[in-house]
């Protein structure tokens, strides 16, 4: 991202604690947040507590271990979700937007030219790469764990679990192109009912065994580690499943605002979750060991009386579908941001709602996710097996968030290092402990999100590096505009109409203009050199949308500024531009684009295999014509070769 773009972003300023740009009454925003933000963390009770006692490193379901695990879950929620994300990280918004890429864009303004800048950018990109691995596992484990509840209704349902889960997931991905704006209105009320049910079921069992409430004392977590050091460390790999989805609170801040999300977490979601976890523990503690060993394989659904288990399965399935929808929508949003920030090649993006700018659909991401999610379900077959693959990507991303927030505290907010260091040390210690515990899962399935993360990281960094090299090569070969204008106007024939030459750089003469003059020997009476720039902010105000310069002799330079959450529409902006003569008439305007063909070279800038990978990505990127919404019958593409 350029310093010019950062300057545009800085015009509005940014300060800690920005409340977001969501609109609506507080009550409506709280209900909306419950329906979208908390789906992932809200479905964790289906498998998190179970996995510590029936997973790959099972603990005996006795009082020491149950109270220790419950204490770890509670204090993890308090430290990681409440303190780290709600109290600290959610104050580091980028003009109201949250998420790793928004935070990275915010930091980028202060990191240019700094020694640590490149490392921080790579960390942020890796967090984005890990997100794609997580977005494949979340729908698979959530829906599968809910459908597995059918076996608590009738054991004979077991063979039907896999096909039902696959059918639900396929249907979910198939409807994405139609958008979810209409059914999305039901997400909030459904999740409100779901969380209320969690709390009621948990409270019912806590009343029967209130002794379980002593687990809220951190001493029981400490005692767990003192008496069962290795087992307690391994158990953290399952305990962390209770806080997966915490990063969604920050990522979705732009949609609902910091206050509604924080309020709904503290007042409603956190109590409901903890009541349910404590209820599961109370139920197991009330049973003899033989019964407990059977119950622990599905304690969530066994909280309900037998006659209510089928309705609970249906409700839980609806909740997991909503959680999966939030993850899929998040993947679309993150991809759009990454495209605008220059980490992913242009992809086809369609809007599924005329009334909501955030309702988008990216076919390539949708079908790619669907294939991988179905493969995961068919390969791992049970949610318990999938739990072994879950967590490592989340804990890795959380650790990176800690690194990014450290930069924000010291370099953006100006905290004293002596004050920031202890806070960051606590966050880092927790993140490292959870990440280390999850590394033990690598042989059992943890390799999958790491593999996806490294593949995505390779693609993201290859595109980012290749794109920068290509821009630099084009800039090196560019002719100064002043020289071109002085020489061309005296030798070229001028024809009626307007020619718009798009270029990625706001300096020099576009290659498409040079090629057009070389082959056609004419210039239009009005020539626009147009650059679209993406700022380090999510949105750019209309007053700063267009920068204009009159170059003389009928030549004009126009720079259109967009935020990384905005959808470029070049004709719409040009139709409102009055700075370079009469208004634009599309039927009198031609758009000239350069289509670059890459020639891999022996230059040391990139390895040959990465040059070839970048060339393949460039060939398969969506054309600038479609991405910038240019009228197809007014576009001329001119080829050029670039050696990087």
Swiss-Prot record:
Keywords: Cell inner membrane, Cell membrane, Ion transport, Membrane, Potassium, Potassium transport, Symport, Transmembrane, Transmembrane helix, Transport. GO terms for cellular component: plasma membrane. The chain crosses the membrane at residues 26-46, 69-89, 120-140, 155-175, 183-203, 231-251, 265-285, 312-332, 360-380, 390-410, 419-439, 444-464. Its main location: membrane. It is found in: Cell inner membrane. It comes from the Bacteria. It is a multi-pass membrane protein. Pfam families: K_trans, K_trans_C. Coiled coil: none annotated. InterPro entries: K+_transporter, K_trans_C, K_trans_N, Kup. Disulfide bonds: none annotated. Residues 1-21 are annotated as: Disordered. GO terms for molecular function: potassium ion transmembrane transporter activity; symporter activity. It catalyses: K(+)(in) + H(+)(in) = K(+)(out) + H(+)(out). Transport of potassium into the cell. Likely operates as a K(+):H(+) symporter. Belongs to the HAK/KUP transporter (TC 2.A.72) family. PANTHER family: LOW AFFINITY POTASSIUM TRANSPORT SYSTEM PROTEIN KUP, OSMOTIC STRESS POTASSIUM TRANSPORTER. This is Probable potassium transport system protein Kup 2. It comes from Rhizorhabdus wittichii (strain DSM 6014 / CCUG 31198 / JCM 15750 / NBRC 105917 / EY 4224 / RW1).
């Amino acid at each position: 991202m350029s310093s010019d773009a950062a300057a545009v972003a800085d015009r509005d300023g940014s300060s800690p604690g920005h409340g977001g740009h969501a609109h609506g009454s507080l009550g409506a925003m709280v209900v909306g947040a419950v329906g979208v933000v908390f789906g992932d963390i809200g479905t964790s009770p289906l498998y998190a507590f179970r996995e510590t006692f029936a997973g790959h490193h099972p603990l005996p379901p006795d009082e020491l271990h149950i109270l220790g695990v419950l204490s770890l879950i509670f204090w993890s929620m308090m430290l990681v979700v409440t303190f780290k994300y709600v109290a600290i990280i959610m104050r580091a918004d980028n003009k109201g937007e949250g998420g790793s890429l928004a935070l990275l864009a915010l930091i980028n303004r202060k990191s240019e030219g700094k020694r640590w800048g490149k490392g921080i950018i790579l960390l942020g990109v890796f967090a984005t790469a890990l997100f794609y691995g997580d977005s494949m596992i979340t729908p698979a484990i959530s829906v599968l764990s809910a459908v597995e509840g059918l076996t608590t209704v009738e054991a004979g349902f077991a063979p039907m679990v896999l096909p039902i889960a696959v059918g639900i997931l396929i249907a979910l991905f198939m409807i994405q192109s139609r958008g979810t704006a209409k059914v999305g209105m039901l997400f909030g009320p459904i999740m409100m009912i779901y969380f209320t049910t969690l709390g009621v079921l948990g409270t019912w069992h806590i009343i029967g065994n209130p002794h379980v409430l002593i687990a809220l004392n951190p001493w029981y977590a400490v005692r767990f580690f003192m008496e069962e050091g290795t087992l307690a460390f391994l158990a953290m790999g399952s305990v962390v499943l209770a806080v997966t989805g915490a990063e969604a609170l920050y990522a979705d801040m732009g949609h609902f605002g910091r206050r509604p999300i924080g309020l709904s977490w503290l007042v409603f979601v956190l109590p409901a979750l903890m009541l349910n976890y404590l209820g599961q523990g109370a139920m197991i503690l009330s049973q003899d060991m033989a019964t407990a060993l059977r119950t622990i394989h599905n304690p969530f659904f066994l909280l309900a009386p037998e006659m209510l288990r089928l309705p609970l399965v249906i409700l839980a399935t609806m909740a997991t579908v909503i959680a999966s929808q939030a993850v899929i929508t998040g993947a679309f949003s993150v991809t759009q941001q990454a495209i605008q920030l220059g980490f992913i090649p242009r992809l086809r993006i369609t809007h599924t709602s005329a009334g909501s700018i955030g309702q988008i659909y990216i076919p390539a991401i949708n079908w790619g996710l669907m294939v991988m999610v179905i493969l995961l379900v068919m390969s791992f077959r049970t949610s318990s097996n999938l739990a072994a693959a879950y967590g490592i990507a989340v804990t890795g991303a959380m650790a990176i968030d800690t690194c990014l927030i450290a930069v924000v505290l010291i370099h953006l907010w100006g905290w004293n290092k002596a004050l920031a260091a202890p806070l960051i040390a606590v966050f880092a210690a927790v993140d490292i402990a959870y990440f280390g515990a999850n590394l033990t899962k690598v042989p059992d399935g943890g390799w999958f999100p790491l593999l996806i993360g490294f593949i995505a990281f390779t693609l993201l960094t290859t595109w980012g590096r290749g794109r920068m090299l290509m821009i630099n090569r084009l800039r090196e070969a560019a002719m100064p505009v002043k020289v071109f204008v002085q020489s061309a106007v005296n030798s070229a024939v001028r024809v009626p109409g307007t020619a718009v030459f798009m270029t990625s750089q706001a300096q020099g003469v576009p290659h498409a203009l040079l090629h057009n003059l070389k082959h056609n020997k004419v210039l239009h009476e009005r020539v626009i050199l147009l650059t679209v720039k993406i700022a380090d902010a999510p949105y750019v105000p209309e007053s700063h949308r267009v920068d204009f310069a009159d170059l003389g002799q009928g030549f004009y330079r126009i720079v259109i500024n967009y935020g990384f959450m905005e959808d470029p529409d070049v004709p719409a902006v040009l139709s409102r531009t009055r700075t370079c003569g009469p208004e634009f008439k599309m039927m009198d305007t031609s758009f000239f684009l350069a289509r670059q063909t890459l020639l891999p070279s022996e230059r040391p800038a990139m390895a040959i295999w990465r040059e070839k990978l970048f060339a393949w990505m460039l060939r398969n990127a969506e054309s600038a014509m479609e991405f910038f919404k240019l009228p197809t019958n007014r576009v001329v593409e001119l080829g050029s070769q670039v050696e990087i």
